From Swiss-Prot:
GO molecular function, one term: D-aminoacyl-tRNA deacylase activity
Reactions catalysed, as given in the entry: a D-aminoacyl-tRNA + H2O = a tRNA + a D-alpha-amino acid + H(+); glycyl-tRNA(Ala) + H2O = tRNA(Ala) + glycine + H(+)
Co-factor requirement: Zn(2+)
Note describing how the cofactor binds: Binds 2 Zn(2+) ions per subunit.
Pfam family, one: tRNA_deacylase
InterPro entries, per database record: Deacylase_DtdA_archaea, DtdA
Enzyme class of the recorded protein, top EC level: hydrolase
Full protein name: D-aminoacyl-tRNA deacylase
EC number(s) per entry: 3.1.1.96
Length: 252
């Protein structure tokens, strides 16, 4: 089951709560409220999305967590983003069908000037059993409090959580830009995107192994950007993947 995580320290979560007033309280666990978003449980806590570390609570409610959050960037522009969290060298469990379905829905419903992007794996929390997907609105206070923009996010969630998810090839990406350059393959239904290891990570085989084993669906394809993953690490990564009969796509 899905579980939505809303953080009172986050302006997008607060706008979400304003837009969806009918979220009946189910129970209180300490300072954390468990409410209902449609037919799905929603956790409301006082901190920031990246501070939430109650995986035990998530697992008691569902296996697939969706964190509602603001997005920030150095050169702000209106944007919807989706990504799996992870503060390397560890990461959360990625849910490629869910993350990619939400990404497609956001892109489908986004109105100018909003764009959409699939981001590389970054920032906490790190989960071990429950999957974690961040869904974000950016990139300034104006967008975080834009009820129409956050309404698109709500619409995308309601649409995705109420249907079967895609069945494209689960794909991991190694050495990509922070804003993934292979997102079009997800939009057209060819792949379901999982962990994206950014080029600034200085990827090692251990990074790849950690990410590879933390997906809800088996990784079938890995895109490796050659110029951003230097040997001997690149050769080790390719060997590891091919030994597991994973399709390796070398780019760049």
């Amino acid at each position: 089951m899905y579980v939505v995580v809303l953080s009172l320290g986050d302006p997008v979560s607060r706008t979400f709560l304003e837009l969806v007033p009918e979220m009946p309280l189910v129970e209180t666990r300490g300072e954390i409220e468990v409410r209902k978003f449609g037919e799905w449980p929603a956790v409301v806590h006082k901190g920031e999305p990246t501070d939430f570390n109650r995986e035990d609570l998530l697992l008691s409610l569902g296996k697939y967590a969706i964190f509602i959050s603001r997005h920030e960037m150095a050169n702000p522009r209106p944007m919807f983003t989706v990504h799996t969290p992870g503060s390397w060298p560890d990461v959360s469990v990625a849910n490629p069908p869910l993350a990619t379905a939400i990404f497609r829905a956001l892109c489908r419903h986004a109105e100018e000037p909003f764009k959409c992007a699939f981001e590389a794996t970054h920032h906490p929390p790190n989960t071990s059993a429950a999957s974690a997907t961040f869904v974000e609105v950016g990139s300034t206070e104006a967008e975080w409090r834009d009820r129409r923009a956050v309404g698109v996010l709500v619409q995308a969630l309601e649409e995705v959580l109420g249907r079967e998810l895609g069945a494209g090839a689960t794909t991991m990406v190694v050495g990509d830009l922070h804003y993934s350059t292979v997102a079009d393959s997800a939009l057209n239904g060819e792949v379901e995107l999982g962990h994206i290891l950014p080029k600034y990570l200085e990827t090692t085989l251990q990074h790849v192994k950690t990410a590879f084993y933390k997906h809800t669906t088996p990784v079938r394809r890995v895109v490796v950007f050659r110029k951003n993953v230097k040997n001997p690490a690149r050769a080790e990564v390719v060997e590891f993947l091919r030994e597991r009969e994973v399709e390796v796509v070398l780019k760049g």
